[in-house]
Amino acid sequence: ITTQGGPNWLQIFANNGDGSFTDITQATGINLTKPAFSIAAGDYDLDGDLDLFFAHWLTDNTANPLEHLWQNQGDTSFIDDSQTLEIRTIKGTFLATDRSAEMEYSLTPIFADVNNDRYPDLLLTGDFNSSQLLINNSGVDFVDQTTDVFSDKAGMGAAVADYDNDGDLDWFVSAIGDPIANNLEFAAYSGNRLYKNQGMGHFVDATNEAGVRQAYWGWGSCFADFNNDGYQDLFVVNGYDGLSEEDSVRNIYTIFNENPAVLYVNNGDNTFTERATELGAIHTQMGRGLACFDYDRDGDQDMFIANSGAAPTILRNNHFAQGQHFLNIRLQGLTANPQAVGARVYITVADEQRMIELQLGNNYLSQNPVEAHFGVGLAQQVDSVRIEWPGLGGDITEMENVAIDQFLVIPHPDI
């Protein structure tokens, strides 16, 4: 799936299985009349196939507020089911016409089950204080449970993971927070946010406790265990070049031009320490999209960065996880959801449990591979693996005494 500017906002290509693709955009029935930014895929109605959500930044929601949530009909076609949720809008004015409208500023959607009821909820990161928590009401509709806790002013990217290993999913939002900009009178420059899940989808703002507020002009972000110690670390790419021709505005934006990426290493006590320069994760280009995965399959997580106006960057992790072990798990799902998106993978190591939920389209303008990479430290085996497959059928796969340092593929029980 690709999105772009111009009259054709969307293109969808089917993989033919032989290295070629076929354009099936028209057959899907998805006809966007406004530009789309990030895309998320998830089975929100738990009927076995993957549905889609499109974020539409800086678009007029007055005339046509739909085109967000597309329900898969099981035959490669989709219908617009956006009436089941309400997207927050902000009153704005088109400068060229002085026309006022209700503007949408959503940027990064993520399907994730934050209240542990198996139904994927929707975490929607938005600019200008428009981020939302939309709780899935058993596949019927979504209930807006956004509270004052969600205080990010300029949400751009997002990442979701269980960073404190307590069995539920937490939410990080990248935003704007340069030390110089914080001295300016701009309310939007208040930094990142980390929302810690206290259970059943009840969040608290743990940003200051965790020490992750500062990340310049943040975009793509990802949770990944870069040192294989069993705790999810956090990587964020930054940078912005002002587009305004007004000198006063452009001068403000130039402070973000060469902002470095930040690597927050999880200390295992609900706090993080920024160590990007120390560990060689140095990146000062205009980062946007980000994928964190083991691209060279050597047992540790690397970074692939899509840059604005420049070639991509690969940061290869060669030493940070040295001596620490891992277990990488991919799932083979059923035909309509072959990667088992929405499944939960649990492992137990020395009586400690860790969990990763498989997500698709979970980064700003990008996505990680659909796999679960666990660092297990110095452990010599994984005591148990438990797969909770997506859906309401209650399918479970369990394994014991699993060998470390391997890439494991686990098929669905019905395969």
Regions found by a protein language model. Give the residues of each.
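Beta-rich catalytic cores
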Residues: 8, 35-40, 65, 105, ...
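Gly/Ser/Thr/Pro-enriched helix-cap/hinge segments flanking short amphipathic alpha-helices
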Residues: 271-415
